[in-house]
Structure formats: C-alpha cells, structure tokens
C-alpha cells in the first residue's frame, strides 16, 4: 500500500536496520508495539478503545517494513525499532484504508485488535 502510494520499503529488515526487534524467525514471533499518539482519533479503527493502554503485544512474521512514507500515510503504531506496525491513509484521500504489519487473524477471535479491525471493516463496507 505504501509503495503503491509513492512510499518505499526496507527490503530486508535485519540487513538494513538490524534486529533489535525480531520480526521474523522460523515461526511466528511476538513483540510489543506502541501507539505513536494515543489521542489520535484514527487509533479507534485498529485498536480497542482504552485510555490507559498505549502498547499492545502482536505477532510478527515479516522481513520487510515501511521506509519512506507516502503522502497521506499516517503511522498509528511502531515497534521498538521504530518500524511502522499500523497505518491508515488520511480519510481525505481514501474513505477507509487500514493496514498492519502483523496478523490480527492469528491473535484470536476474542482479541481486541482483531475485533476492532473486523468491526470497522464491516462498517466501512456497509457504508458503501
């Protein structure tokens, strides 16, 4: 999405930025991500509403990551190595675009992120 909108990628995270956070191994890896701005209204598209939580444990299974951001891409969450882990596209450019660098479908059906993303996706579909 970022590349299609004019941004760029790190082709290989361990080679290009190091491995202070393991994003990929021989299986699924868990690590923490934190909200860049806990007050950002876009957060509610991906993350469950809770004013006391600003970090989440997610799974990871990727070796590429966002580098230069395209115009209109807003980073909602990053990992400790500063890689974007959750983004949205400014709603002035697109009515609904959310993306994450983890697998919400593997977090469990009762996970707050999975539920929030699913519910907001269905709401966006129903608006069309």
Regions found by a protein language model. Give the residues of each.
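Amide-donor transfer/coupling interface in amidating biosynthetic enzymes
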Residues: 14-128
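Catalytic nucleophile loop
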Residues: 1-8, 103
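Acidic/charged, solvent-exposed loop-and-adjacent secondary-structure segments enriched in E/D, K/R, S/T
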Residues: 11
């Amino acid at each position: 999405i970022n590349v299609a909108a004019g941004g760029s990628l790190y082709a290989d995270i361990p080679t290009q930025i190091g491995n202070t956070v393991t994003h990929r191994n021989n299986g699924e890896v868990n690590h923490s991500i934190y909200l860049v701005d806990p007050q950002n209204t876009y957060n509610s598209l991906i993350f469950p509403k809770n004013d006391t939580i600003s970090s989440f444990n997610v799974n990871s299974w990727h070796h590429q990551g966002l580098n230069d951001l395209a115009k209109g891409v807003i980073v909602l969450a990053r990992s400790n190595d500063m890689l974007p882990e959750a983004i949205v596209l400014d709603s002035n450019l697109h009515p609904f675009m959310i993306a994450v660098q983890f697998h919400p479908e593997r977090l469990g059906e009762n996970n707050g992120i999975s539920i929030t993303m699913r519910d907001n996706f269905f709401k966006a579909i129903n608006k069309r």
